[in-house]
Structure formats: structure tokens, C-alpha cells
């Protein structure tokens, strides 16, 4: 799992379907001419894993079940619900997390809460990630060279929010949810030589500023009859998603 999605048995990118609560995620868009110079943002929007309750991974072609784009396999995320964050016998729950790693100086902060009261279920989750380039054992000063051992400097910040509210009566449940994510990455490209060079030897070939912005809206009606001999569950979804990918590269 990486910047361009999942790789299953050697198949990756748009050939592996990714969906969240049944809604397919945006695919990568790659320009063959500009991508070789790092001038286009070919990343695939990533869903915040702190909001995930369950992951289903299927290998092999499954386009009949998951639609186009599932040549190599399919991955379906299922997001958290209010009752998954609340202990039995309570009507509310709060969770928080602080973590990090030394390899990329990464940090993660998450905070959320949920409440269940008289058929009403609600939750709100927020997560923020920051980090830098993955460090290696490269030495020497940072210089323009395709043979450089030090990684190109990079810094990113990702902010995500998930909100849900639901009302349950009898065998029926109506849920509305909203999800947003904004990831900004600033980088310096020292190791990828362009077709022309206009900068001095003491500056990078390129300065990069990439942004990935995602918003999605969901309304779900679920009917689960307890005494039906022919119907197990009925689901009706109305959803929408907007994804914006921007790459600002300058020398």
C-alpha cells in the first residue's frame, strides 16, 4: 500500500479497485510526457486509515462484483460507526492517539468521540499526519546529481475529518456522513535532471508543491428485517465525491 494505491500479486495502481463503504475511490491520472520529469501529481487519494473499522482484500480479477478497475483485485474499507467506539453499558466514548516514527520523522495525532442516545448515533473523528522524506544512510552535502545518495528533501501535512449521524427505529436505519481530507506536500528535487537547467548548482532542479483534496458525502438507508424468510438486508445509497489533485512545479 503506497502513494498509488495497492499492489496485489504484481498488479497495482488503477488495476486494483479501492472503495470506501461501497463508494469507489478516485483513480490516478498520469501524463506520459510530463510524469517522467516529475511535473504532474499522479498520486491516488488515500483514505485515512485511523477511520477504518474493517478491510476486505480480494486477489484476482473481480470486475463483475466490484466494477471496472478490479483486474488485479479489490480492496474495500469499512469506516467506523458510533457503537464501535463505545463500551457496552455506556452512551458515549472518546478516543485519542499520538504516534510517530523515526524513519521519516512522522507524527500522527487523532481525536474522536461518539454518542448513542435513544436511537440517535453520532460520531466525529479528526486525524492529522506530518512527516518528511524517508531517511537513509546517505552522506555528503545535498547537491544536484542523479548519483546522489541523500534523499530529496520533502515535507507533508495531511488533515482528515469524518462525521456521521444516524437515526435507528425498529428494523430501519438512516445514516448521513461527511468526509474530507487535505494533503499538502512541499519538496525539492535534486536528483532528477530535467531537459533544461536554468538554476545554479547550489539550488535544486525543481521546487514542488503538491496538493490532494478530497470531499465525499453519503446518505444510506438500511432495512434489516428480523422475521423475513426471503429478505436479509436492503441498502439504498446516495453519495457523491470530489477529488482535486494539483502539482505546482517550478525551477
Indicate residue ranges for each PLM-predicted region.
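Face-selective signature of the C-terminal outer-membrane beta-barrel domain
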Residues: 168-181, 212-251
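Transmembrane beta-barrel architecture of outer-membrane proteins
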Residues: 3, 42, 70-72, 91-93, ...
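Structural signature of outer-membrane beta-barrel domains
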Residues: 13, 25, 80, 101-103, ...
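Membrane-embedded beta-strands of outer-membrane beta-barrel proteins
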Residues: 6, 55, 94, 110-111, ...
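Transmembrane beta-strand segments of Gram-negative outer membrane beta-barrel proteins
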Residues: 53-54, 72-74, 79-102, 122, ...
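Periplasmic-side early beta-strands and strand-to-turn transitions of outer-membrane beta-barrels
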Residues: 91, 104-108, 112-209
